[in-house]
Every structure is written in C-alpha cells, then in structure tokens.
Amino acid sequence: MAPETNEKCKACGGFNFSMIDGFKYCDRCGTLLENFEELEAEEGGIQQTRGAGKIKIKKKGGDDGEKKTTNLVSTNESNVQIMRKALEKRSDFFSRQALKNDELAFPHESTPDYLYRLGLRLAAFTQVLAKVGHVLVKELNFEPRVLPTILATFQRYLAHCHVAFCHSEQCGSDEQLRFVAMMENLEFEQQEREEKRRKKLARRGKGVKALSKSAAAWTLLTQGNITENLDLDSEEDEEEEENPNLNKSMENLEFEDTQNDETVAVNDTTVGFVRKITTALSTEALRRARQMILNLEILVAIIHSALMSCGYRNVLASDVVRWIREDRFRISLRSIRLMRHSAKEQETKEAMTKVDYAEPYLRFPLYEITRTSTLFHQSLNLNEKLVSLNFETLAARLCDNLNLPVEFLSRVLLLESMIPCDVNPSLRKQADVSMGHNCEQLAAIQPKLYNSGFLSCFGRKERTWREADNCDESVKLALLRIQCICRVLLSPDTKLMAYILLVFRLTFDIDNATCSPDSKDALKFDIDTWIHQLEMRLKCWQEHDMSMVLRSSCPVPDIQISTPFGPNYSYYDKKGNPWVHRLRRQVGFAKCIPSEMSFNSTSSLPTVFDIRQNRFKTERRQLEAVMSPLKFQRVILRKEMERDPEKYRNIVDPDSEKTFFKDFTVRKVLENTQKIAETSNSFDEYFPCASRYTIYKRPDWIQNCTARSKQLSPKIGPYRFYISNQACDDLLGVATSSFSPRFKFLLDSLALIIGEDPKALYTAFVMLEMHLTSSDTLETIRESLLRSKPITVKCQKFRKTMWHVECLRRVVTEHPVGKIEDLKYFIVASTRESQEELAESSEAYLMHFRNHEIREDLTSLEAEKVQNRVLKLAYDFETFFGILAVKMW
C-alpha cells in the first residue's frame, strides 16, 4: 500500500503499511499505526494486560469541539467589539504607566505591601548620606573623618531603633520570630513547562523499564505506543522525584550568628504561584525599620551631630539647613521621593507616615527642625560624643556675617556674661524625651498609635477635640489631619539673634530717634546706614535684580505671597462649603533664604522660570560663601558689575553702591567708647538707652502651655510646662502694634537670616528681656523652684458660654531638685484662699452680674454644674512666662 504523507512507523521507521481489518500494520515489524479511534470505541479505550501495571491510552483531539465552538463565537463578534477590547487593553497599559499622587512608578505588584518600599528607602537615604559626606570633604574642605562619622552616626541610629547592627536584628533558631516573605512566583509558567517536560521524560524511562520486566511485552509492543501515549502508574513509583537543579542557589544560603554561633539556613519554598521565603531576619526588626523616621529633618540632625562629633564648634543647625536648600549637596528629587513611603500606605487607616508625608521638602521654620533634631540627639544620647558649643565663637561669627563693629560684639558678650545662655544642642532644659517617646519607642509602637506617639515624644499631648484641631488618636487618626505638636523650641541660633536684637535696643534709640544725616566722622557707626546696607544685601541674597535695588528710588516688591488666613492655615472646599484648617506644623514656610529647595543640579530638564539660579558656582565654594553668605554678597555684586558694566553705569545710585560695600567692623559704636572702657564699668554707660528702656505690649494671660504627664488618662498626674504656638502668636500679635519700623525690620531680617519664624525669635527676645528687666522676680522664682516653695499664680477659668471666673493656683515642683536642669514636672493646685479673695474683690459683683446676665434662665443647680465644668485655664503672663524663662533659658 502506498504510504500517505507523514506516515512513519515509530518502532522501526518503515514507510510501508498493510490494511488488515480496518487497521494499518507495518510490513517490516507488524506494529499497529497509532490510530486508536476504533479501538477506543470498541473496547472503551482501556486494554488490560497482565504485567507490571495498567496501560492507559490517551485521547487525542478531545478539545477540538470546544476550540471550534470558541472560534465560531469569536468570529461572530463585531468589529466594534474587537476594537473596543483592543482599546481597553491599550488604555489599561497606559494607566498603569501613569504617575499617581506625585509618586514614581514602582513594581508594587511584585513587591509585598508589608515591605513598604523598605529597601528603596534605606538605599536612597544611605546614598544621600554618602553624597553629603563626599561634598563636605571634597568641596567644602571639611576633614576627611567627617564622611565615616556621618555613616557611623546613621549606624548608631539604626542600632538604637533595633533595626540593624544589633543582636535583635537576628532571630536565631526560633522559627516563630523569623520573617517569612510571601511573594509571587514570576517564573511559574516557565517552571510549569519544565516540570511537564521532566515528567514526560520520566514516564518514557519508566515505560522502557516496565517493558523490560513485563511478561506481556510482545502484546504491548504490538498494540500500544510506548514513547508518548504509554502511562504507567506503579505502586513502587508513586512519589515524584524532585528536580535537583530547582532552587539550587537558595539551598546553600546560610546566615551566621556571631554571638550564638548558630547557623540558620534560609528556606525557599515555591508552591505554584506562591513563593515562600523563610529568612533569618527578625520580624520585629523589619517592623521597626518600616516605621522609623527617614526624612530631611533626620538628615539635618545626622549631619549636625557628625560635625559636632568631629570638633566643629562654629557650625549651627541653620547652616546645615541652608546648605540643603542651596543645593550644595545635590540631593535629587528622585532621592527625596524614594525616601518617602508609597501612596498605597497613605490610603490606609493605619498610615504611620503622615509626619513625613506632610512636608518632604524641608519647608519648615527652624524651631520645627530643631524639635526633630532634639529628639534625635536625646534619643541617641550623644552628649558625650558632641563638643560643647562656644557662645563667644558663634556670636563672633554672626556679627562678622552681619558686618557689625567689634565693639558691638563686646557688648553682646558683656550681656551674655550677665545673663548666661544655654547653647547645648540637646536642649535638655526645654524638653526631655524621657517624658514621652524616643526614636526607639516610636519605631516599636503600633501603627494605630504612631502619630499620637510622635506628637507626644516630649510628653505633650492635645487634650480636647477643638484644642487638638483634629489632632487626637483613634477616631481622629482616621481623618489623617495630624501634623505635629504645637511646642516651640528655642535653638541656639535663635538665642544668639535675641542677644543681638536686645543689644540694638539697649545701645541705639531705634524706636523714637529720627533718621540722622550722614555723620562726618568716618569712624562712627551709623545704624541707619547699616540698616540700608542690610536691606540691600538681603535683596541681593534673595536673587533680586541689583540694578533695581541700587537705585535711589525704586521699590523692590517681595517675591513671597502671604496666604489668606495666615502662614499655617490651609483653605479648601468640601462639598461646596469653605473649610479653614489650622496645621499643627507650620508647613510651607518660606521666610528663609532660599525660600525653597533648589534641584537645578539634579533636574533632567532646565527650569525656564526659576529665579533661584546659582550665580558664580565656583565662588560659592569659598569659606566665606559657606559660613558668611550675607557678607559674601559683596563679592557677588562686584562680579556682576565687572561682567556687565553698562547695566550699572548710569542707573546705580553712587551713595547706595558705596553703602553696599562699606565695612563697619572697625567703626565705633559710641563716640566716647574708649573713655568709658577706661574709667567706668557702669551698665548705663555701656548701654545708653537702658535707663529709658520701654517694654512692648504683652498679653495679660497665657494659655495652652500646660499638659498632664499621663498620656492615657490626661486628667491625672503632674503637669509639664512648655511654649506653645498659640502663646507665641499671642505674644507677637499683641506687641506688633507697638513696634517701630526699625525694630520690625530688624526682627524680620534676623529671623530671615537663620530661617526662623519671627514669632519664635520674638519669644526668645522677651525671655531675655525679662531676665534683664525683671531680674528680681525671676530670682525669686528660681529660689522657690529650687526649694520647692509654692508660687502663687493668678488664673482665669473660662467656661462654657463665655463664663469666666478669676482664681488662684499654686505651682510647685513635683520633687525637690538641686539644679534647674533637672526640673521636669510641676504640681498645679487650687488654693482655698481663692474664693475668699474673690469675695473681697471690688470687681466680684460686676463679674457675677456679667456671667449671670448671659444665662438668666439658669437654675441654681445648672449654674453649679457649669461652674464645675472648666474648658480652659489661663495663667497670668508675667508669672507663668517668668517660670518658663527660668526653666528654659
């Protein structure tokens, strides 16, 4: 019989077949051609023989009907439906590639959600630290040991949080504490194909082995196909052999524990689409790592701590913040985004990252950054490693940057010798992390309580819904409006500027004196000329057009635009209704130089309308540009005038140009300064305006500056005292109307130089002023605190519906202390004499009449209940702020 196409005997390879009873047999060996349709129909597809096992004959083409049906259905679809499906696939692809929520596209599908991009955050933060250390050493000419010190400080931070470089990072042989990663097996399809091929080859080998031992081998050879369609299921070979090459690279991976001398093998198990990896990493360490704070505020704290550990006494925290904003470290926008948590975490109710997510670009005033740095310093206990800051060195640096006379510096040092100042960067006198949560405790806290724990890191906690402004735990956490605590910490930078500001008021009559004409004495210091120079140099530092600044009459508008409701208020529409929300942290702060971070050196595309361009980058690496940027502006202006002389030839005012480059360091503050120094040591002769010194307006009462020590039950326990945002706002708001234009300009300018909010600088100024003007009162308060004697403070209890009643409180320390630095908690108790004094007061009747006039329908029982319900307690400003001045200065 002539062979048909593709017909070949698979036993002997012959091409000639004979038809016998409807079946084809090979003419050479007699093997049946592999077509079992009639055999399947007649005998049911199963042939039983006596041998080693059962012989199963497979069906071919069983799914042809289904395939034909599917093809018929697909051909019946219209072209519109086919195009719609193709368009949906294409739109899904582009939607997956699009950036959402200002985040980069990362493979979230293949990364477990519980990892929180941990590897990306740690790697990005470490790379930024390494780059910062390289720039400090190679470009800013710091010592080479700064780089390893920065990395060692970060290592200590990880060890403190029990994340890495510690024994708790490993779990040993306890499998319950191991971290088990459940991941998607991306190579499942490929492994499945390889497994099918392996089983197919194994069946062939088993079939050959069965044929060699079977008694009915001839029957099998003549009636079955032993290469593909023969499937033997023997009792001896029920268990499948595992692939020895599968996951060979993971089986030999071991981890050594140096302390316990235990060897922990990493188990990698793959079951279908799921890949289960049992690691030697502790689950607790991973949980702490994903909750630890990694942002630019911690970066500032690490850099400042490393520089002070290397012995640099003249570097302030404001300098490090300014270097980051000036793009000296070339931190890219991508690195900042990698340090942040992903958008998926922000959508969950247990998001612990709103503290970092609210402001990632360091747009904070200095006191906000100081708070995080203080938390870092006190948590790691770096006091032994850090060098002590020298007030004289720092004051000389600031006076040189401001181009002030040397005699002015001597007056600043004289004032500091009379009123000592604590310039320790740990700020133990203002805040103590032992009263709340440190970095290690924040990393170990539950996600639901993380935000409230961060708010109470120094023991402060908002008490009521309205006072907290959606800043409480549990229910309020779901709203995700938490920003931060309302505590203001006075940094050493702010205290130094407060001394300079007070010396100006004590030496010059900046409030009442008129603008004096130019003095003929070339060696006399003219404060009006110096203020003009300060204003022009600040404009030059802010990148204004100097051809406009140096004109005789040309107003230079401010670049910044104030928000409608204040600097720390946000306005938004909610369902058509306007909402004004007060932020706990002053995010979006722009009263600094530069006002925002610049990414010019790391951006892929140039910014066309960016006014923050870096002029003369080579000169920016000079020591004067790094440490005295305001004084360095004379070099910048001189370079610009040399580059484009035609621009400044006929426009610039000669007097303004002369004032801009004038040197005041050798000028005399007063005409008879040398005579005063030789003949007398009187305070009034050194400070001529001290005898007629006037105090600006101050509020009568201060509130929201106390909190209980108990976090879970805020109605019991002793109190802690602090400076709140509201107290600073009230203090500056009341005094602003009495400011003179000169003092207002000096306050804003000095705060602008260090990147501080003017209200924090004025609060430090008032504290220093109280030490000078109310020294007897503060000394009495100091002795009472050290001896644990009660201090009587006048108060007002504000109740519902504007009820308020005067009362008295006695403030005493919780425990006797030997020095003010050890003072933590206070006991505030009511006095029995309070009601008697109120009864004898001349205003008691008027107050009683006014309170009851508001609610005439109140019964006696209701009035008694209202009197016992106190909403707020305001303290007398002079006494309470005096306690804060003694404790914190």
Swiss-Prot record:
Molecular-function annotations in GO: RNA polymerase I core promoter sequence-specific DNA binding; zinc ion binding
Main localisation: nucleus
Protein's UniProt name: TATA box-binding protein-associated factor RNA polymerase I subunit B
Zinc finger (RRN7-type): 1-33
InterPro entries linked: Rrn7_cyclin_C (IPR048538), TAF1B/Rrn7 (IPR033599), TF_Rrn7_Zf (IPR021752)
GO cellular component: RNA polymerase I core factor complex; RNA polymerase transcription factor SL1 complex
Domain of life assignment: Eukaryota
Region named B-reader: 35-101
UniProt binding sites for Zn(2+): C9, C12, C26, C29
Domain topic, free-text comment: Although it shares weak sequence similarity with GTF2B/TFIIB, displays a similar subdomain organization as GTF2B/TFIIB, with a N-terminal zinc finger, a connecting region (composed of B-reader and B-linker regions), followed by 2 cyclin folds.
Localisation per UniProt entry: Nucleus, Nucleolus
Described function: Component of RNA polymerase I core factor complex that acts as a GTF2B/TFIIB-like factor and plays a key role in multiple steps during transcription initiation such as pre-initiation complex (PIC) assembly and postpolymerase recruitment events in polymerase I (Pol I) transcription. Binds rDNA promoters and plays a role in Pol I recruitment.
Keyword Isomerase in annotation: no
Source species: Caenorhabditis briggsae
Keyword field: DNA-binding, Metal-binding, Nucleus, Transcription, Transcription regulation, Zinc, Zinc-finger
One GO biological process term: nucleolar large rRNA transcription by RNA polymerase I
Region (B-linker): 102-113
Region ranges (N-terminal cyclin fold): 114-351
Compositionally biased spans, kind Acidic residues: 230-243
Region (C-terminal cyclin fold): 352-510
A matching Pfam family: Zn_ribbon_RRN7
Family: Belongs to the RRN7/TAF1B family.
Region (Disordered): 229-253
